[in-house]
Amino acid sequence: GDVAKGKKTFVQKCAQCHTVENGGKHKVGPNLWGLFGRKTGQAEGYSYTDANKSKGIVWNNDTLMEYLENPKKYIPGTKMIFAGIKKKGERQDLVAYLKSATS
């Protein structure tokens, strides 16, 4: 994926609810620092739904690609109000950006 394009997508579609930097604060959604390799529902100090806490998968390229296509299908009961990104290329760019920005 293209990190620069992914950053644009993040700013347009994600940044109103999420921060990415180390020590960034939780907004409507959790701060995403340390996302890769972490289990669902584990950002410290954020109040998750039981659905997110009990999903039990680890965030990586594949799980994020699937989740970001249709969040409510992947984690029924999530409170993330986001329809998803249908275009595979756009998701690949976003995941590339998240990988670089959150670690």
From Swiss-Prot:
SUPFAM superfamilies: Cytochrome c (SSF46626). Binds 1 heme c group covalently per subunit. GO terms for molecular function: electron transfer activity; heme binding; metal ion binding. Heme c binds at C14, C17, H18, M80. One of its GO terms (cellular component) is mitochondrial intermembrane space. Keywords: Acetylation, Electron transport, Heme, Iron, Metal-binding, Mitochondrion, Respiratory chain, Transport. The modification N-acetylglycine is found at G1. Gene3D superfamilies: Cytochrome c-like domain. Pfam families: Cytochrom_C. It is found in: Mitochondrion intermembrane space. Electron carrier protein. The oxidized form of the cytochrome c heme group can accept an electron from the heme group of the cytochrome c1 subunit of cytochrome reductase. Cytochrome c then transfers this electron to the cytochrome oxidase complex, the final protein carrier in the mitochondrial electron-transport chain. Belongs to the cytochrome c family. This is Cytochrome c. It comes from Thunnus alalunga.
